[in-house]
Design a protein with these regions (language model features):
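Sec-dependent bacterial lipoprotein signal peptides
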Residues: 1-14
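Lipid interaction determinants
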Residues: 16-138
């Protein structure tokens, strides 16, 4: 039993070293990075140029983004410990295809309580539940 436990710990440590190295090397800063939505409410989102993006701006803790066709703006508060509050949000009022997804997008943003980073990915959570996943744009 002791050998099995030691072997399991060694295998886990070896695997994590590569993961942590990748995560640190490819991690992007929360602020100043343009984030592209790739998953919303557990469903994959096809990345479309100029749609469903988000940028956290340092000046006055502002947030800017684009939904299906509307510009989204507002404020955010973030801590280094992963606490994140977004909103209230405002947006332009154009109508276009994809409005249901845009509504779900803004609701996910406003319900966010925490964030986590995984390599070039930004994960938004609401009370422990994954709400949205973004990938850093190059």
């Amino acid at each position: 039993l002791r050998i099995a436990v030691i072997a399991a710990i060694a295998a886990l440590a070896a695997g994590c070293c590569k993961c942590r190295s990748y995560q640190k090397k490819n991690r992007r800063p929360l602020v100043g990075t343009e984030w592209q939505l790739i998953q919303l409410g557990g469903k994959a989102v096809k990345p479309e140029e100029g749609k469903f993006t988000l940028t956290f701006l340092a000046e006055e803790n502002r947030i800017a983004g684009v939904g299906a066709c509307n510009r989204i703006m507002g404020r955010y508060e973030a801590t280094e410990k992963g606490v994140l509050k977004i909103g209230p949000l405002a947006s332009t009022m154009m109508a276009c295809p994809g409005m249901e997804q845009e509504d779900a997008f803004t609701k996910a943003l406003e319900s966010t309580t925490h964030y986590d980073m995984d390599g070039p990915m930004l994960l938004l959570l609401s009370n422990g539940e994954l709400r949205a996943v973004f990938q850093a744009k190059p």
